[in-house]
A protein has these predicted regions:
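Short, Lys/Arg-enriched N-terminal segments with co-localized hydrophobic residues
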Residues: 1-21
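Bacterial N-terminal signal peptides that target proteins for export
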Residues: 19-32
């Protein structure tokens, strides 16, 4: 059992590369050799509370994470993983350590910082880190890693987490078409990578399914899975001018329900909807955006959730508390195992009764789980 008598919450410090490292552990500071990748300084520590004040005793397990570009409070992908990390800290008593990546140049140094901090497990967040985390795993066979939305090149100490986001996105597309008064719905992505286009393809075929079921023509702008062409921002910078321009162009093309798959683009889309003066909606990604970002709630129809918080927590719990051995087996989140889901419907005003639509969505969900419906067309 680690001694928690002098544990305190430190400040963040930015490294010369622009990345930010946070340590929440005493252990991570012991014998620290970060080779210039980051600095960790404890400051302003108050007196440690009595053990009786802590609901969960600290355990000797250090769980770490390295973000994709952006911050942990991106209201989307990074934040979902970070919340799994802090949930494990709060409920299980594990110690945690993390590093934010300002750019791809930070991926390697940040992973090395976690290795040097003697992390028991390090979670690399996002497809963009896949090369760096595979290299780190191969160079450090005794260190355990998890890659979210990535894959393993064969290292047994690297566990991939993936999601069948086409499944919940199919339901989102069906819902979007039901809501739309123009029967034109839109989608666009941050970058054209499989972790993004998987959402967009499911959405496309879900919208087409609503049209087929109801004898109406539905058009999807922003993505064509047959030609693999569509609208992409080129990065995941939150609420960029490019994002707003794409949303505005899709609205100009008739779309009144938009599905931006690029992290937090909901400010950009809501502005485009407001400026166009339409009764538009948007569908969130990764988290239940109506709940997590109430400032956007009035425009949110639903969200295609990628429940990374649960997956991260469950993996840490299995090893740190339940005593299971680490393995490199692929975890895939699906509708069946609750790894992905469609959030509650809000702000619906389509012609079809909401109760009937919700019953149909449950029917479609069951069909996807059974294999009778292919959300990829």
């Amino acid at each position: 059992m680690a001694n928690s008598a002098s544990i305190c919450r430190p400040e963040r410090h930015t490294t010369s590369e622009g990345n930010t490292l946070t340590s929440l552990t005493k252990r991570a500071l012991t014998g620290l050799a970060l080779a210039g990748a980051a600095s960790l300084v404890l400051a302003g520590c108050a007196a440690a509370p009595d053990a009786s004040d802590s609901a969960v005793p600290e355990i000797d397990y250090l769980a770490c994470a390295v973000s994709d570009e952006g911050s942990w409070n991106d209201k989307s992908f990074n934040q979902s993983v970070y919340e799994g990390l802090t949930k494990a800290q709060d409920e299980l008593g594990v110690q945690i350590n993390d590093a934010e990546s300002a750019s791809p140049d930070d991926f390697g140094p940040n992973l090395q910082a976690m290795i040097d901090a003697s992390c028991d497990i390090t979670i690399a967040v996002g497809f963009n880190l896949v090369d760096a985390v595979n290299a780190a795993a191969e160079a450090n066979p005794d260190v355990n890693f998890v890659t979210v939305d990535g894959w393993s090149n064969g290292a047994t100490n690297l566990k991939p987490i993936g999601y069948s986001m086409n499944q919940s996105s199919y339901l989102a597309g069906y819902l979007a078409a039901a809501q739309s008064s123009t029967k034109v719905v839109g989608t666009y992505g941050g970058m054209q990578i499989p972790a993004v286009t998987d959402f967009m393809t499911g959405y496309y075929y879900g919208a087409m399914a609503w049209g087929a079921d109801n004898g109406e023509t539905v058009k999807v702008v922003g993505w064509d899975p047959a030609t693999e062409t569509g609208d992409f921002i080129g990065d995941f910078v939150p609420n960029s001018g490019t994002s707003k321009s794409i949303a505005a162009a899709q609205i100009q093309a008739g779309a009144d329900v938009l599905f931006p798959v690029g992290g937090d683009q909901f400010g950009a889309v809501s502005e485009a909807i407001t400026e166009a003066g339409i009764d538009g909606r948007m569908i969130g990604v990764d988290k239940d955006i109506a709940a997590s970002s109430p400032e956007y709630a009035e425009w949110i129809l639903s969200s295609a959730e990628k429940r990374m918080t649960n997956a991260v927590y469950d993996i840490i719990k299995a090893i740190a508390v339940d005593g299971e051995a680490f393995n490199g087996d692929y975890y895939i989140g699906t509708l069946e195992n609750g790894g992905t889901a469609l959030s509650a419907i809000t702000n619906y005003s389509g012609a079809q009764m909401q109760s009937e639509l919700e019953a149909k969505l449950e029917e479609l969900k069951a069909g996807i789980i059974s294999g009778d419906i292919n959300p990829l067309g």
